[in-house]
Every structure is written in C-alpha cells, then in structure tokens.
Amino acid sequence: MTDPLLIPCPACNGLNRIPAERLADQPKCGRCKSAVLLDKPFELKQGDYASQIKGDLPLLVDVWADWCGPCKSFAPVFEQAAAQLAGKCRLAKLDSEANQQLSAQLGIRSIPSLILFRNGREVARQSGAFPLPQLMAWLRSQGI
C-alpha cells in the first residue's frame, strides 16, 4: 500500500487524503462531500489558488477570457483532456478578466495560456490553443 495522496477539493478547498488505489472510486471530500476528482475542468479563483496548487496530483490551469476567440475554440479540447486525464491530473479554468490580480501575479502575457503546477510550484507553461493530440503530447512530455 502506498502513501495516500493529498488532493484539494475543487468545491471547498479542503485537503483530502486519498489512497492511490482508490482514485478510480470517485472519492468524495471529507468536508463538503463533493467529488474530489472531476472529469471536467473546475473554476479556479483568486481565493482558491493557494489551496489548489498544493495537491499531490498535477494541476493544469487554462487561463482564458470570454472575449478571446482562440480561448473559446480551445475550451472543448480542454474539456476532452479533463475527461481523459481524470485521476492523473486535475484541470482548472482561470478567467483572466474576473481574476486580474491573480493573472498579473502569474505573469500572464497572452491567452489562452496553460500553466502546469506540481506540488505547489509551476513546472511548465504553454501559450496558445492547439488540438487535443498536441495537448496530450505536451502533457506526456511533462510526465503526465
């Protein structure tokens, strides 16, 4: 048996200890009873950021804006990736307009931008919209 993974709840930010062998069992948050692992992206906000990047599973953040055409065309690709990566990587969307302070803190210069976090630290960044095979290849190159 391996050490449990620490995974923040996307709904309440509560930190959950989940054994690796139970990741496929759709674990629920001990605090709010919401699903801890989703097969779709969750919304990341300024107040959630510090808690959400700390988890043991990687977190891929799509920084986007409603007025951005490439962001809108990339949204379905990101949704498909979330479904394929459930239990391996968590995916979140950060609205750069609604979270301008966090976007500035992250040094966002263009959108869409993807930022990969692992154990509380940024490990990779990619700008632009691209097809699902290219996104998955980039994530594989990052060890996901």
Segments (PLM) and residue ranges:
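Short Cys/His-rich micro-motifs in 6-15 aa windows
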Residues: 32-41
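Cys/His-rich microdomains that often coordinate metals
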Residues: 13-16, 35-36, 75
